[in-house]
From Swiss-Prot:
GO BP terms, alphabetized: regulation of DNA-templated transcription; regulation of RNA stability; regulation of translation, ncRNA-mediated
Gene from which this protein is expressed: hfq
Assembly description: Homohexamer.
Record-linked CDD domains: Hfq (cd01716)
Listed GO CC annotations: cytosol
Protein name (database record): RNA-binding protein Hfq
Amino acid sequence: MSNKGQLLQDPFLNALRKEHVPVSIYLVNGIKLQGNIESFDQYVVLLRNTVTQMVYKHAISTVVPARAVNFRVDEAPDA
C-alpha cells in the first residue's frame, strides 16, 4: 500500500487504539467483529475482546467506532 493510503488509516486507527474506543469491524464476507484495537500495521489489525484476533486488512470492509473520535491528518502538499 502506498504511503498516501496510510494518511487516513494510521491516524484513525491510532486514535481508536489510544482512546480505547470499542469498534465494530465488518468483514467483506459480512461477519461482524467487535472489540478494541490493540495494535495494527500495514497488513493486520489486532482486535481484542475475550481473546486477541489478528484480522487482515484486506478482509475488512468497514470500521465503525462506538463513539465519535477526533484525529489529525498531517497531509503533505501534492507536488
